[in-house]
Regions:
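Ligand-binding clefts/hinges and TM-proximal coupling segments of bilobed small-molecule sensing domains
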Residues: 25-34, 41-52, 105, 139-180
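Solvent-exposed, acidic/flexible segments
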Residues: 43, 67-71, 86, 90, ...
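Short, aromatic/basic amphipathic alpha-helical patches
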Residues: 50-57, 96-101
Length: 180
């Protein structure tokens, strides 16, 4: 899956420019040096790398939003100019923006430096005989699924610029997994 990143409105791109390194945002520097708040879904894990940065963020650097529609509400706050930067998972942001009738070309996504372009998903179960058996069966199933079709379905949610790279990276990933 595409990694989490920061999204801004096109008109607010300059907010991130001082923190860009090779097209990626230095999130630690942004949180430490700016009076602008970053909108986050409260109590969500963004992965170990980003979570560590968020836990070290200065007081008041984040605007956490709670509830089932937290991301949609953050995007609405952004659209109204109350918030300039939102942290999230790009396909989810694209979907929620579409639902809120925010045109995709109004938003610009920036990856976070050091986070990695793609994320692996994980399944966890309780550490019991049944849980270990479930994980074993899930792992076996994942190795034999027809990934090509699933990868195409996922890629359809990505912006056109990311689709080809994702499909190539996913193909290589699953080939490596099958060889193990």
């Amino acid at each position: 899956a595409v990694g989490n990143g920061l999204v801004v409105r096109q008109q607010d791109r300059s907010v991130l420019e001082p923190y860009l390194v090779d097209g990626e945002v230095d999130l630690s520097a942004l949180l430490a040096a700016t009076d602008r708040k970053v909108g986050v879904v409260a109590e969500r894990s963004y992965g170990e790398f980003i979570d560590n940065i968020l836990h070290q963020a200065p007081s008041g650097a984040l605007t956490p939003h709670y509830g089932n529609d937290a991301l949609t509400n953050l995007l609405s706050m952004q659209r109204l100019g109350r918030l300039q930067v939102v942290l999230g998972y790009w396909p989810e942001i694209r979907y929620q923006a579409r639902q809120a009738q925010i045109a995709e070309n109004e938003l610009e996504f920036y990856p976070i430096r050091g986070n990695g372009k793609y994320l692996s998903g994980y399944v966890a179960c309780s550490d019991t005989t049944q849980g270990r058996q479930a994980i074993s069966e899930i792992n076996q199933l994942l190795r034999t699924l027809p990934h090509e079709h699933l990868n195409q379905l996922y890629a359809a949610w990505l912006d056109p610029e990311r689709q080809a790279d994702y499909l190539e990276q996913a193909r290589a990933f699953f080939e490596r997994q099958a060889a193990q």
